[in-house]
Swiss-Prot record:
One of its GO terms (cellular component) is mitochondrion. It catalyses: (R)-glycerate + ATP = (2R)-3-phosphoglycerate + ADP + H(+). It holds the Pfam family PRK. InterPro entries: P-loop_NTPase (IPR027417), PRK/URK (IPR006083). Its EC number is 2.7.1.31. Induction: Isoform 1: Expressed in the light. Isoform 3: Expressed in the dark. Belongs to the GLYK kinase family. Keywords: ATP-binding, Chloroplast, Cytoplasm, Glycolate pathway, Kinase, Nucleotide-binding, Photorespiration, Plastid, Transferase, Transit peptide. This is D-glycerate 3-kinase, chloroplastic. It comes from Arabidopsis thaliana. Pathway: Photosynthesis; photorespiration; 3-phospho-D-glycerate from glycine: step 4/4. ATP binds at residues 215-222. One of its GO terms (molecular function) is ATP binding.
Length: 456
């Protein structure tokens, strides 16, 4: 006789199951310590007391050789820039104090003062996850969260290690960034890969899924893709990351573009449509899609933005990173991915100089967008956020003793992109990218602090 179980009972029993197991196998050592320690996600057996609705942690001694053999080191993200923190774009996520490049400690003035929160309670974490703005949007039910809570714990622990966060004492913004943003998006990406793979038969060469990330500059898309790429690698899925920046014209090509468009500020520097090597884009995307077997390798283009006094040039091919098949996914990010050409009178009303950029944009669908199978579109409420985000980054760089643009230079830099944002974002947000399947587009609204929010 079948027994019906209510949703709440299923969640309760699932959490009880996960809280009576030992969270040890395949969990990384916490990033804030070089020695194995007992913390909220590692080396604890959690028991559930029916008489008391709370979880009790019991420490397990992790000194056995078996445990040591399971705790292999994981690479951490240790590059420091801007205000001396590993979170370059996501300032609200870093520790209140950071180490500058000369070894001195200073307060990060860009950070809000937030209280730390203890995430040791799995039941509290479950409730926090379910309160996020993305869970319903991507079809993650409370039942599914309960059934996969061990994955959420694992992914959270891995991201804490990557970004050198103390997983015992995450601030509320840190906790939200991981469990309301990065991990839900990663789970959505996993679902998209599973859907993609299901369309092929056993034994077929399955091309990697291409996920496009369209998001304005400074909103944190590079950090998001960095986190997703890391999680894919820790889950044994091979991934490749590329950016529209990788396909900018060479310095010589940029000079020719300026010469052909005298007086057009939108094409004076790299950035807008027309300043990319679309042939290289096609060659790269098609070559990556063929990395379906072990042993197949290729180098992926990269761009050196600091060359020629900041005008930039393609990096020497000897420095390009190498990727190896079989690839499961390609993460392709860019500020103008998915932009569609508009009628000439519409773009001229925004900025007359945008007309030639709009004409150039006609070639971009066949070079970029048609290769993208699924989309993450990060939406902002006001394009002027880009100016404030860029200004924050440059101020932080100057405070750290690095070369940064002045406020006036930031204004000039961003002004070359704002016409495109004003012209193309409304259509992108209303209709989605050209040729995209609405069921495979994840639209994420973020606020000025770069956190996901519920759309109005």
């Amino acid at each position: 006789m079948a027994v019906a179980i209510s949703g709440s009972s299923l969640i309760s029993s699932t959490l009880q199951h996960y809280n009576n197991r030992i969270y040890i196998r395949d969990y990384p050592i916490p990033c804030h310590s070089s020695n194995p320690i007992c913390n909220s996600f590692n080396f604890k057996r959690r028991s559930f007391s029916p008489s008391s609705p709370k979880f009790n942690d019991h420490v397990v001694n992790p000194s056995s050789s078996y445990l040591s053999s399971k705790l292999s080191p994981i690479r951490t993200h240790s590059s420091f820039a801007a205000c001396g923190c590993s979170w370059i774009q996501d300032n609200s996520m870093v520790h209140d104090y950071a180490t500058t490049t000369n070894g001195t400690s200073k307060r990060c003035s860009a950070l809000p003062t937030t209280n730390t929160v203890d995430v040791s309670s799995v039941s509290d974490l479950f409730e926090f996850i379910c309160s996020g703005p993305l869970v319903n949007k991507i079809g993650i039910t409370p039942q599914r969260v309960g059934q996969s809570i061990d994955k959420w714990l694992l992914y959270g622990s891995q991201l804490c290690r990557l970004f050198q966060l103390n997983e015992l004492k995450l601030t509320i913004p840190q906790k939200a960034r991981l469990y309301h943003y990065y991990i839900p998006v990663f789970i959505w990406c996993e679902d998209q890969i599973a859907l993609h793979n299901s369309k092929f038969k056993d034994g077929d060469d399955v091309p990697p899924l291409v996920i496009g990330f369209s998001a304005p500059q400074g909103c944190g898309k590079t950090t998001l893709v960095f986190a997703l790429d890391y999680l894919f690698k820790t889950t044994k899925k091979k991934s490749a990351t590329i950016s529209v920046d990788d396909f900018y014209l060479t310095a010589e090509g940029q000079a020719e573009l300026r010469k052909k468009n005298p007086g057009n500020a939108l094409l004076e520097y790299r950035g807008n449509a027309g300043s990319h090597d679309l042939k290289l884009s096609v060659e790269t995307l098609e070559a990556l899609s063929k990395l379906t077997k072990e042993g197949l390798k290729m180098k992926v283009p990269r761009y050196n933005k600091s060359a020629y006094s900041g005008r930039g040039d393609r990096a020497d091919s000897s420095t390009w990173p190498e990727v190896e098949g079989p690839l499961s996914v390609i993460l392709f990010e860019g500020w103008m991915l998915g932009f569609k050409p508009l009628p000439a009178d519409v773009v001229k009303a925004v900025d007359p100089q945008l007309e030639v950029v709009n004409k150039n944009l006609e070639a971009y669908y066949d070079a970029w967008d048609k290769y993208i199978d699924a989309w993450v579109v990060i939406k902002i409420q006001d394009p002027s956020y880009v100016y404030r985000w860029r200004l924050q980054a440059e101020i932080a760089m100057r405070q750290d003793g690095q070369a940064g643009m002045s406020d006036e230079e930031v204004n000039d830099f961003v002004s070359r992109y704002l016409p495109a944002y004003k012209a193309y974002l409304p259509t992108l947000y209303a209709e989605g990218p050209s040729g995209s399947d609405p069921d495979r587009v994840l639209a994420i609204d973020i606020d000025e602090e770069r956190n996901p929010i519920l759309a109005n």
